[in-house]
Protein backbone atom coordinates (compact mmCIF):
# COMPACT_ATOMS: atom_id res chain seq x y z
CA UNK A 1 0.00 0.00 0.00
CA UNK A 2 3.38 9.41 -5.79
CA UNK A 3 1.87 12.10 -3.83
CA UNK A 4 3.83 15.28 -4.32
CA UNK A 5 4.07 17.92 -1.62
CA UNK A 6 1.07 20.19 -1.91
CA UNK A 7 1.87 23.54 -3.53
CA UNK A 8 0.28 26.91 -2.96
CA UNK A 9 -2.68 27.39 -5.30
CA UNK A 10 -3.18 30.72 -7.10
CA UNK A 11 -5.92 32.91 -5.74
CA UNK A 12 -9.12 33.32 -7.78
CA UNK A 13 -8.02 36.85 -8.65
CA UNK A 14 -4.80 35.54 -10.17
CA UNK A 15 -6.66 32.92 -12.20
CA UNK A 16 -9.03 35.34 -13.90
CA UNK A 17 -8.05 37.14 -17.12
CA UNK A 18 -8.09 40.97 -16.67
CA UNK A 19 -10.13 42.91 -19.22
CA UNK A 20 -8.92 46.00 -21.09
CA UNK A 21 -9.08 49.15 -19.00
CA UNK A 22 -11.50 51.92 -19.82
CA UNK A 23 -14.80 53.47 -18.72
CA UNK A 24 -17.71 51.08 -18.38
CA UNK A 25 -20.04 53.20 -20.55
CA UNK A 26 -17.73 53.13 -23.51
CA UNK A 27 -19.55 52.65 -26.81
CA UNK A 28 -18.84 49.37 -28.63
CA UNK A 29 -16.35 49.53 -31.48
CA UNK A 30 -17.77 49.90 -35.00
CA UNK A 31 -16.42 49.28 -38.44
CA UNK A 32 -17.01 52.87 -39.62
CA UNK A 33 -14.37 55.60 -39.30
CA UNK A 34 -14.58 57.89 -36.32
CA UNK A 35 -13.37 61.53 -36.26
CA UNK A 36 -13.55 62.14 -32.51
CA UNK A 37 -10.55 62.19 -30.15
CA UNK A 38 -6.89 62.96 -30.68
CA UNK A 39 -4.17 60.74 -32.02
CA UNK A 40 -2.16 60.89 -28.77
CA UNK A 41 -5.08 59.86 -26.58
CA UNK A 42 -5.88 57.02 -28.94
CA UNK A 43 -2.29 55.78 -28.79
CA UNK A 44 -2.31 55.94 -24.99
CA UNK A 45 -5.47 53.83 -24.86
CA UNK A 46 -3.94 51.20 -27.12
CA UNK A 47 -0.81 51.01 -24.94
CA UNK A 48 -2.90 50.78 -21.76
CA UNK A 49 -5.03 47.95 -23.16
CA UNK A 50 -1.99 45.99 -24.24
CA UNK A 51 -0.31 46.42 -20.88
CA UNK A 52 -3.24 45.14 -18.83
CA UNK A 53 -3.93 42.02 -20.87
CA UNK A 54 -2.68 38.81 -19.28
CA UNK A 55 -1.89 37.26 -22.65
CA UNK A 56 -1.40 38.69 -26.12
CA UNK A 57 -4.56 38.83 -28.17
CA UNK A 58 -5.09 39.20 -31.91
CA UNK A 59 -3.75 42.37 -33.45
CA UNK A 60 -6.35 45.14 -33.71
CA UNK A 61 -6.71 46.26 -37.35
CA UNK A 62 -6.73 49.99 -37.91
CA UNK A 63 -8.50 51.56 -40.90
CA UNK A 64 -7.52 55.06 -41.92
CA UNK A 65 -9.73 57.44 -43.92
CA UNK A 66 -8.20 60.61 -45.38
CA UNK A 67 -5.31 62.66 -44.01
CA UNK A 68 -4.62 64.58 -40.75
CA UNK A 69 -6.78 63.63 -37.79
CA UNK A 70 -8.83 61.05 -39.69
CA UNK A 71 -8.03 57.53 -38.50
CA UNK A 72 -9.78 54.22 -38.08
CA UNK A 73 -10.82 52.65 -34.81
CA UNK A 74 -9.06 49.76 -33.14
CA UNK A 75 -11.13 46.56 -32.95
CA UNK A 76 -10.56 44.83 -29.56
CA UNK A 77 -11.96 41.32 -29.30
CA UNK A 78 -13.21 40.64 -25.76
CA UNK A 79 -11.54 37.47 -24.41
CA UNK A 80 -13.85 35.01 -22.59
CA UNK A 81 -13.18 34.45 -18.91
CA UNK A 82 -11.52 31.20 -17.93
CA UNK A 83 -13.33 29.12 -15.29
CA UNK A 84 -11.88 29.61 -11.85
CA UNK A 85 -11.07 26.49 -9.82
CA UNK A 86 -12.11 27.24 -6.27
CA UNK A 87 -10.15 24.80 -4.10
CA UNK A 88 -12.11 25.24 -0.93
CA UNK A 89 -13.72 22.65 1.32
CA UNK A 90 -17.19 24.14 0.76
CA UNK A 91 -16.94 23.91 -3.03
CA UNK A 92 -15.48 20.41 -2.80
CA UNK A 93 -18.34 19.13 -0.65
CA UNK A 94 -20.93 20.80 -2.90
CA UNK A 95 -19.38 19.22 -5.96
CA UNK A 96 -19.22 15.80 -4.35
CA UNK A 97 -22.86 16.01 -3.22
CA UNK A 98 -23.93 16.88 -6.77
CA UNK A 99 -21.82 14.12 -8.27
CA UNK A 100 -19.39 16.48 -9.98
CA UNK A 101 -16.72 13.86 -10.62
CA UNK A 102 -15.19 15.82 -13.44
CA UNK A 103 -15.16 19.19 -11.71
CA UNK A 104 -11.83 20.98 -12.34
CA UNK A 105 -9.49 20.65 -9.41
CA UNK A 106 -11.53 18.10 -7.45
CA UNK A 107 -9.28 15.16 -8.31
CA UNK A 108 -6.18 16.87 -6.99
CA UNK A 109 -8.04 18.17 -3.98
CA UNK A 110 -9.27 14.67 -3.11
CA UNK A 111 -5.70 13.40 -3.36
CA UNK A 112 -4.52 16.10 -0.97
CA UNK A 113 -7.32 15.22 1.45
CA UNK A 114 -6.43 11.52 1.38
CA UNK A 115 -2.77 12.27 1.97
CA UNK A 116 -3.65 14.57 4.86
CA UNK A 117 -5.97 11.91 6.32
CA UNK A 118 -3.24 9.26 6.18
CA UNK A 119 -0.88 11.63 7.99
CA UNK A 120 -3.35 12.63 10.71
CA UNK A 121 -5.24 9.36 11.28
CA UNK A 122 -2.79 7.76 13.77
CA UNK A 123 -3.18 10.52 16.37
CA UNK A 124 -6.99 10.23 16.17
CA UNK A 125 -7.24 6.46 16.67
CA UNK A 126 -8.81 5.10 19.85
CA UNK A 127 -8.80 1.46 20.94
CA UNK A 128 -11.66 -0.96 21.58
CA UNK A 129 -10.47 -4.42 22.61
CA UNK A 130 -12.21 -7.45 21.11
CA UNK A 131 -12.94 -10.65 23.02
CA UNK A 132 -11.57 -13.79 21.36
CA UNK A 133 -11.96 -16.32 24.17
CA UNK A 134 -9.14 -18.84 24.74
CA UNK A 135 -7.56 -18.58 21.27
CA UNK A 136 -3.77 -18.41 21.23
CA UNK A 137 -1.84 -15.60 19.49
CA UNK A 138 -3.31 -13.96 16.37
CA UNK A 139 -0.64 -14.28 13.67
CA UNK A 140 -2.42 -13.03 10.52
CA UNK A 141 -5.42 -10.88 9.59
CA UNK A 142 -7.24 -9.28 6.63
CA UNK A 143 -10.41 -7.21 6.30
CA UNK A 144 -13.18 -9.00 4.40
CA UNK A 145 -15.63 -6.09 4.49
CA UNK A 146 -16.54 -3.12 6.68
CA UNK A 147 -17.42 -5.35 9.67
CA UNK A 148 -15.55 -8.64 9.32
CA UNK A 149 -11.88 -9.54 9.72
CA UNK A 150 -10.51 -13.01 8.96
CA UNK A 151 -7.69 -14.18 11.25
CA UNK A 152 -5.28 -17.08 11.69
CA UNK A 153 -3.83 -18.14 15.05
CA UNK A 154 -0.98 -20.13 16.54
CA UNK A 155 -3.48 -22.78 17.69
CA UNK A 156 -4.24 -23.42 13.99
CA UNK A 157 -7.64 -21.75 14.00
CA UNK A 158 -9.06 -19.83 11.05
CA UNK A 159 -11.95 -17.58 12.05
CA UNK A 160 -13.93 -14.47 11.10
CA UNK A 161 -14.64 -11.89 13.79
CA UNK A 162 -17.34 -9.22 13.61
CA UNK A 163 -15.68 -6.07 14.95
CA UNK A 164 -19.03 -4.60 16.04
CA UNK A 165 -20.43 -7.57 17.96
CA UNK A 166 -17.26 -9.64 18.72
CA UNK A 167 -19.05 -12.65 17.20
CA UNK A 168 -16.59 -15.33 16.05
CA UNK A 169 -17.26 -17.79 13.21
CA UNK A 170 -14.73 -20.60 12.80
CA UNK A 171 -13.81 -21.77 9.29
CA UNK A 172 -13.19 -25.52 8.78
CA UNK A 173 -9.65 -26.26 7.63
CA UNK A 174 -8.94 -28.37 4.56
CA UNK A 175 -7.33 -31.77 5.04
CA UNK A 176 -4.62 -33.36 2.94
CA UNK A 177 -5.67 -36.12 0.57
CA UNK A 178 -3.26 -38.48 2.34
CA UNK A 179 -2.97 -37.37 5.98
CA UNK A 180 0.41 -37.84 7.64
CA UNK A 181 -0.52 -39.97 10.64
CA UNK A 182 2.99 -39.72 12.07
CA UNK A 183 2.68 -35.96 12.39
CA UNK A 184 1.36 -34.77 15.73
CA UNK A 185 -0.90 -31.77 16.38
CA UNK A 186 0.46 -28.70 14.56
CA UNK A 187 2.39 -26.32 16.79
CA UNK A 188 3.05 -23.79 14.04
CA UNK A 189 -0.38 -22.37 13.39
CA UNK A 190 -1.57 -20.14 10.55
CA UNK A 191 1.02 -17.47 9.81
CA UNK A 192 -0.46 -16.03 6.61
CA UNK A 193 -3.88 -14.94 5.34
CA UNK A 194 -3.94 -13.11 1.99
CA UNK A 195 -6.69 -11.93 -0.39
CA UNK A 196 -6.22 -11.81 -4.16
CA UNK A 197 -6.45 -8.38 -5.87
CA UNK A 198 -10.16 -8.69 -6.73
CA UNK A 199 -10.96 -9.99 -3.22
CA UNK A 200 -12.63 -13.10 -4.63
CA UNK A 201 -10.17 -15.66 -3.22
CA UNK A 202 -8.44 -16.12 0.12
CA UNK A 203 -5.20 -18.07 0.55
CA UNK A 204 -4.00 -19.42 3.89
CA UNK A 205 -2.73 -22.62 5.50
CA UNK A 206 -4.55 -25.93 5.73
CA UNK A 207 -4.99 -28.32 8.63
CA UNK A 208 -1.49 -29.39 7.72
CA UNK A 209 0.50 -26.11 7.95
CA UNK A 210 2.69 -27.31 5.06
CA UNK A 211 -0.26 -27.06 2.63
CA UNK A 212 -1.74 -24.02 0.86
CA UNK A 213 -5.53 -23.66 1.19
CA UNK A 214 -7.64 -21.44 -1.10
CA UNK A 215 -11.21 -20.37 -0.27
CA UNK A 216 -13.78 -18.55 -2.38
CA UNK A 217 -15.13 -15.18 -1.21
CA UNK A 218 -17.48 -14.03 0.12
CA UNK A 219 -18.90 -17.51 0.86
CA UNK A 220 -15.61 -18.98 2.21
CA UNK A 221 -16.30 -22.22 0.33
CA UNK A 222 -13.13 -24.31 -0.16
CA UNK A 223 -11.68 -24.23 -3.68
CA UNK A 224 -8.41 -26.17 -3.61
CA UNK A 225 -5.59 -27.40 -1.39
CA UNK A 226 -1.93 -27.42 -2.39
CA UNK A 227 -0.83 -30.63 -0.70
CA UNK A 228 0.76 -32.49 -3.62
CA UNK A 229 4.52 -32.29 -4.15
CA UNK A 230 4.65 -29.00 -2.29
CA UNK A 231 6.38 -27.79 0.86
CA UNK A 232 7.90 -30.19 3.37
CA UNK A 233 7.65 -27.73 6.28
CA UNK A 234 5.41 -24.96 7.60
CA UNK A 235 4.21 -22.15 5.34
CA UNK A 236 5.24 -18.80 6.80
CA UNK A 237 4.25 -16.38 4.01
CA UNK A 238 1.85 -16.02 1.06
CA UNK A 239 1.55 -13.39 -1.68
CA UNK A 240 -0.79 -13.07 -4.67
CA UNK A 241 0.80 -12.21 -8.03
CA UNK A 242 -2.56 -12.00 -9.83
CA UNK A 243 -6.15 -13.06 -9.27
CA UNK A 244 -5.30 -16.70 -10.03
CA UNK A 245 -1.59 -17.05 -9.17
CA UNK A 246 -0.28 -17.23 -5.60
CA UNK A 247 3.17 -17.85 -4.19
CA UNK A 248 4.06 -19.34 -0.80
CA UNK A 249 7.26 -19.32 1.24
CA UNK A 250 8.13 -22.11 3.65
CA UNK A 251 10.40 -22.98 6.52
CA UNK A 252 11.92 -25.64 4.27
CA UNK A 253 13.74 -22.89 2.34
CA UNK A 254 11.59 -23.01 -0.81
CA UNK A 255 9.21 -20.68 -2.65
CA UNK A 256 6.32 -22.31 -4.55
CA UNK A 257 4.15 -20.93 -7.37
CA UNK A 258 0.51 -22.05 -7.46
CA UNK A 259 -2.03 -21.66 -10.28
CA UNK A 260 -5.69 -21.60 -9.24
CA UNK A 261 -7.88 -22.70 -12.17
CA UNK A 262 -11.22 -20.82 -12.30
CA UNK A 263 -12.89 -24.07 -13.42
CA UNK A 264 -12.35 -25.37 -9.89
CA UNK A 265 -14.89 -22.91 -8.49
CA UNK A 266 -17.98 -24.69 -9.83
CA UNK A 267 -16.90 -28.08 -8.55
CA UNK A 268 -15.93 -26.80 -5.14
CA UNK A 269 -19.50 -26.11 -4.06
CA UNK A 270 -20.62 -29.72 -4.51
CA UNK A 271 -21.03 -31.76 -1.33
CA UNK A 272 -20.13 -35.30 -0.38
CA UNK A 273 -23.39 -37.09 0.30
CA UNK A 274 -22.00 -39.20 3.10
CA UNK A 275 -19.55 -36.96 4.95
CA UNK A 276 -21.40 -33.69 4.40
CA UNK A 277 -18.10 -32.00 3.54
CA UNK A 278 -17.44 -29.74 0.56
CA UNK A 279 -15.42 -31.03 -2.36
CA UNK A 280 -12.15 -29.28 -3.21
CA UNK A 281 -9.35 -29.93 -5.65
CA UNK A 282 -5.85 -31.05 -4.71
CA UNK A 283 -3.17 -29.21 -6.66
CA UNK A 284 0.60 -29.16 -7.15
CA UNK A 285 2.86 -26.13 -7.57
CA UNK A 286 3.72 -25.08 -11.12
CA UNK A 287 7.21 -23.99 -10.06
CA UNK A 288 9.43 -24.23 -6.99
CA UNK A 289 12.63 -22.34 -6.20
CA UNK A 290 15.07 -23.02 -3.38
CA UNK A 291 16.69 -20.21 -1.42
CA UNK A 292 20.45 -20.21 -2.11
CA UNK A 293 22.52 -21.29 0.84
CA UNK A 294 24.44 -18.54 2.59
CA UNK A 295 28.05 -19.10 3.57
CA UNK A 296 27.56 -17.48 6.98
CA UNK A 297 24.46 -19.36 8.14
CA UNK A 298 23.63 -22.13 5.64
CA UNK A 299 21.31 -24.04 7.96
CA UNK A 300 18.85 -21.20 8.57
CA UNK A 301 17.52 -20.25 5.14
CA UNK A 302 13.87 -20.38 6.18
CA UNK A 303 11.62 -18.10 4.11
CA UNK A 304 9.96 -15.79 6.60
CA UNK A 305 8.14 -13.13 4.55
CA UNK A 306 7.15 -12.30 0.95
CA UNK A 307 6.16 -9.12 -0.90
CA UNK A 308 5.13 -8.72 -4.55
CA UNK A 309 5.69 -5.63 -6.70
CA UNK A 310 2.95 -5.56 -9.32
CA UNK A 311 4.56 -2.58 -11.06
CA UNK A 312 7.85 -4.40 -11.62
CA UNK A 313 6.44 -7.94 -11.64
CA UNK A 314 9.02 -8.92 -9.03
CA UNK A 315 8.80 -11.01 -5.89
CA UNK A 316 10.85 -10.18 -2.80
CA UNK A 317 11.56 -12.52 0.11
CA UNK A 318 13.51 -12.43 3.36
CA UNK A 319 15.06 -15.47 4.98
CA UNK A 320 16.15 -15.96 8.56
CA UNK A 321 19.81 -16.21 7.55
CA UNK A 322 19.76 -12.42 7.04
CA UNK A 323 19.32 -12.21 3.26
CA UNK A 324 16.90 -10.51 0.89
CA UNK A 325 16.08 -12.35 -2.35
CA UNK A 326 14.45 -11.06 -5.54
CA UNK A 327 12.84 -12.98 -8.43
CA UNK A 328 11.34 -11.94 -11.73
CA UNK A 329 7.83 -13.36 -11.49
CA UNK A 330 6.06 -14.42 -14.66
CA UNK A 331 4.81 -17.93 -15.43
CA UNK A 332 7.82 -19.09 -13.42
CA UNK A 333 10.31 -17.57 -10.99
CA UNK A 334 13.70 -16.38 -12.19
CA UNK A 335 16.08 -15.26 -9.44
CA UNK A 336 17.61 -11.82 -9.94
CA UNK A 337 19.70 -11.28 -6.83
CA UNK A 338 20.37 -12.10 -3.19
CA UNK A 339 21.89 -9.52 -0.89
CA UNK A 340 22.94 -9.39 2.74
CA UNK A 341 20.67 -7.21 4.87
CA UNK A 342 22.24 -4.44 6.97
CA UNK A 343 20.38 -5.68 10.06
CA UNK A 344 20.09 -9.45 9.88
CA UNK A 345 18.60 -10.58 13.20
CA UNK A 346 14.98 -11.72 13.29
CA UNK A 347 13.97 -10.52 9.83
CA UNK A 348 10.35 -11.59 10.13
CA UNK A 349 8.33 -9.05 8.09
CA UNK A 350 8.51 -7.48 4.64
CA UNK A 351 6.34 -5.09 2.64
CA UNK A 352 6.56 -3.17 -0.65
CA UNK A 353 5.97 0.58 -0.94
CA UNK A 354 4.51 1.51 -4.35
CA UNK A 355 4.83 5.23 -3.63
CA UNK A 356 8.64 5.11 -3.53
CA UNK A 357 9.38 1.70 -5.14
CA UNK A 358 10.96 0.48 -1.91
CA UNK A 359 11.04 -2.79 0.00
CA UNK A 360 10.83 -2.35 3.78
CA UNK A 361 12.27 -5.11 5.99
CA UNK A 362 11.58 -5.40 9.71
CA UNK A 363 14.25 -6.81 12.01
CA UNK A 364 15.04 -7.02 15.71
CA UNK A 365 15.66 -3.30 16.09
CA UNK A 366 15.32 -1.58 12.70
CA UNK A 367 13.28 -1.17 9.54
CA UNK A 368 15.57 -1.15 6.49
CA UNK A 369 14.53 0.40 3.16
CA UNK A 370 15.84 -1.23 -0.02
CA UNK A 371 15.77 0.80 -3.24
CA UNK A 372 16.86 -1.76 -5.81
CA UNK A 373 16.71 0.74 -8.69
CA UNK A 374 19.69 2.61 -7.27
CA UNK A 375 21.54 -0.49 -6.15
CA UNK A 376 21.96 1.03 -2.74
CA UNK A 377 20.08 2.00 0.40
CA UNK A 378 19.46 5.71 -0.13
CA UNK A 379 16.92 6.08 2.70
CA UNK A 380 18.41 5.64 6.17
CA UNK A 381 16.97 2.78 8.26
CA UNK A 382 14.67 3.70 11.10
CA UNK A 383 15.47 2.49 14.57
CA UNK A 384 12.51 0.99 16.41
CA UNK A 385 14.04 -0.01 19.72
CA UNK A 386 11.20 -1.02 22.01
CA UNK A 387 12.79 -3.01 24.80
CA UNK A 388 14.74 -5.10 22.27
CA UNK A 389 11.58 -6.93 21.20
CA UNK A 390 11.83 -6.08 17.53
CA UNK A 391 9.50 -5.34 14.64
CA UNK A 392 6.73 -7.94 14.43
CA UNK A 393 4.42 -6.46 11.76
CA UNK A 394 4.88 -3.87 9.05
CA UNK A 395 2.73 -2.05 6.49
CA UNK A 396 3.07 0.96 4.19
CA UNK A 397 0.31 3.20 2.84
CA UNK A 398 1.35 6.16 0.68
CA UNK A 399 4.27 7.64 2.65
CA UNK A 400 3.41 6.37 6.17
CA UNK A 401 4.97 3.18 7.59
CA UNK A 402 3.10 1.49 10.45
CA UNK A 403 5.28 -0.61 12.75
CA UNK A 404 3.87 -3.18 15.19
CA UNK A 405 6.41 -4.01 17.88
CA UNK A 406 6.96 -6.93 20.22
CA UNK A 407 6.32 -4.63 23.16
CA UNK A 408 2.65 -3.90 22.48
CA UNK A 409 2.98 -0.56 20.70
CA UNK A 410 2.35 0.93 17.26
CA UNK A 411 4.78 3.44 15.75
CA UNK A 412 4.35 5.55 12.61
CA UNK A 413 7.14 6.71 10.31
CA UNK A 414 6.94 9.34 7.55
CA UNK A 415 9.18 8.30 4.65
CA UNK A 416 9.05 11.76 3.07
CA UNK A 417 10.14 13.57 6.22
CA UNK A 418 12.34 10.63 7.30
CA UNK A 419 11.16 10.82 10.89
CA UNK A 420 8.56 9.29 13.21
CA UNK A 421 5.22 11.02 13.58
CA UNK A 422 5.05 13.07 16.75
CA UNK A 423 2.39 13.70 19.34
CA UNK A 424 0.59 17.01 18.89
CA UNK A 425 -0.43 19.20 21.78
CA UNK A 426 -1.66 22.74 22.45
CA UNK A 427 -0.83 25.08 25.32
CA UNK A 428 -4.55 25.83 25.72
CA UNK A 429 -7.81 24.66 24.09
CA UNK A 430 -8.00 27.77 21.91
CA UNK A 431 -4.69 27.06 20.18
CA UNK A 432 -4.05 24.75 17.25
CA UNK A 433 -2.09 21.59 18.27
CA UNK A 434 1.54 21.53 17.19
CA UNK A 435 4.16 18.72 17.24
CA UNK A 436 5.49 18.22 20.75
CA UNK A 437 8.78 16.50 19.89
CA UNK A 438 7.61 13.23 21.50
CA UNK A 439 7.28 10.16 19.29
CA UNK A 440 3.65 9.22 18.63
CA UNK A 441 3.10 5.76 20.12
CA UNK A 442 -0.17 3.87 20.48
CA UNK A 443 0.00 1.34 23.32
CA UNK A 444 -2.32 -1.65 23.04
CA UNK A 445 -4.33 -3.13 25.90
CA UNK A 446 -3.53 -6.20 27.96
CA UNK A 447 -5.69 -8.68 26.03
CA UNK A 448 -6.20 -12.12 27.57
CA UNK A 449 -3.59 -14.46 29.05
CA UNK A 450 -3.89 -17.94 30.51
CA UNK A 451 -3.14 -17.54 34.21
CA UNK A 452 -2.15 -21.20 34.58
CA UNK A 453 0.79 -20.60 32.24
CA UNK A 454 1.92 -17.72 34.40
CA UNK A 455 1.92 -19.84 37.54
CA UNK A 456 3.80 -22.70 35.89
CA UNK A 457 6.44 -20.80 33.93
CA UNK A 458 6.96 -17.39 35.49
CA UNK A 459 7.64 -15.77 38.83
CA UNK A 460 4.51 -14.97 40.79
CA UNK A 461 3.66 -11.30 40.93
CA UNK A 462 5.05 -10.43 37.50
CA UNK A 463 2.20 -8.73 35.69
CA UNK A 464 3.92 -6.90 32.85
CA UNK A 465 3.59 -9.16 29.82
CA UNK A 466 2.93 -6.84 26.86
CA UNK A 467 1.53 -8.35 23.71
CA UNK A 468 3.57 -8.70 20.56
CA UNK A 469 1.64 -7.17 17.66
CA UNK A 470 2.09 -9.91 15.06
CA UNK A 471 -0.42 -8.50 12.58
CA UNK A 472 -2.29 -5.34 11.69
CA UNK A 473 -4.42 -4.30 8.72
CA UNK A 474 -6.17 -1.08 7.71
CA UNK A 475 -9.66 -0.46 6.41
CA UNK A 476 -8.81 2.85 4.73
CA UNK A 477 -12.27 3.76 3.36
CA UNK A 478 -13.60 3.78 6.94
CA UNK A 479 -10.33 4.84 8.60
CA UNK A 480 -10.13 1.78 10.88
CA UNK A 481 -7.21 -0.35 12.01
CA UNK A 482 -7.36 -3.96 13.23
CA UNK A 483 -4.46 -5.15 15.38
CA UNK A 484 -3.84 -8.72 16.55
CA UNK A 485 -1.21 -10.52 18.57
CA UNK A 486 -0.49 -12.17 21.89
CA UNK A 487 2.26 -12.81 24.44
CA UNK A 488 5.75 -12.73 22.95
CA UNK A 489 7.02 -15.55 25.16
CA UNK A 490 6.46 -18.92 23.50
CA UNK A 491 5.51 -20.51 26.84
CA UNK A 492 2.57 -18.16 27.40
CA UNK A 493 -0.90 -18.80 25.99
CA UNK A 494 -3.02 -15.73 25.28
CA UNK A 495 -4.30 -13.31 22.66
CA UNK A 496 -4.89 -9.67 21.84
CA UNK A 497 -7.27 -8.17 19.28
CA UNK A 498 -8.21 -4.53 19.04
CA UNK A 499 -10.16 -2.24 16.74
CA UNK A 500 -8.67 1.23 16.48
CA UNK A 501 -10.99 3.85 15.00
Curated annotation (Swiss-Prot):
Q: Does the keyword ATP-binding apply?
A: no
Q: Which InterPro entries match?
A: Beta-prop_DCAF12, DCAF12, WD40/YVTN_repeat-like_dom_sf, WD40_repeat_dom_sf, WD40_rpt
Q: Does the keyword Repeat apply?
A: yes
Keywords in UniProt for this one? Repeat, WD repeat
| WD repeats by residue range | 185-225, 230-268, 298-337, 384-423
Recorded hits in SUPFAM superfamilies, A to Z, give: WD40 repeat-like
Positions with biased composition (Polar residues):
1-37
Spell out the residue ranges making up region: Disordered.
Answer: 1-67
What is stated as this protein's family in its record?
A: Belongs to the WD repeat DCAF12 family.
The protein in question is named DDB1- and CUL4-associated factor 12-like protein 1
**Species annotation:** Mus musculus (Mouse)
Amino acid sequence: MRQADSQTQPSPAEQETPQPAGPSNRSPPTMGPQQTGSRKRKAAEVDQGAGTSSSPGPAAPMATAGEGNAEGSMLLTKRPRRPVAHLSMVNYLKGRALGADGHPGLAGFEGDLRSYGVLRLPELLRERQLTLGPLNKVFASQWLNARQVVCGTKCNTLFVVDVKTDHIMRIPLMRDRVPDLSRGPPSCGIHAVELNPSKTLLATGGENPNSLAVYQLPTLDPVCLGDCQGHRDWIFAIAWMSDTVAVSGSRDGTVALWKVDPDMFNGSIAWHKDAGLPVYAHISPTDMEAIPKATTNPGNRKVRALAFSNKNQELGAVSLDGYFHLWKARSSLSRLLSLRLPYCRENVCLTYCDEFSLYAVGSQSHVSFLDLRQGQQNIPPLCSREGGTGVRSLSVHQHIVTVGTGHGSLLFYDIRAQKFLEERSAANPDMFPVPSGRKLKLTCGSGWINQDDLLENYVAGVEDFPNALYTHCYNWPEMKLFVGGGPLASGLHGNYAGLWS
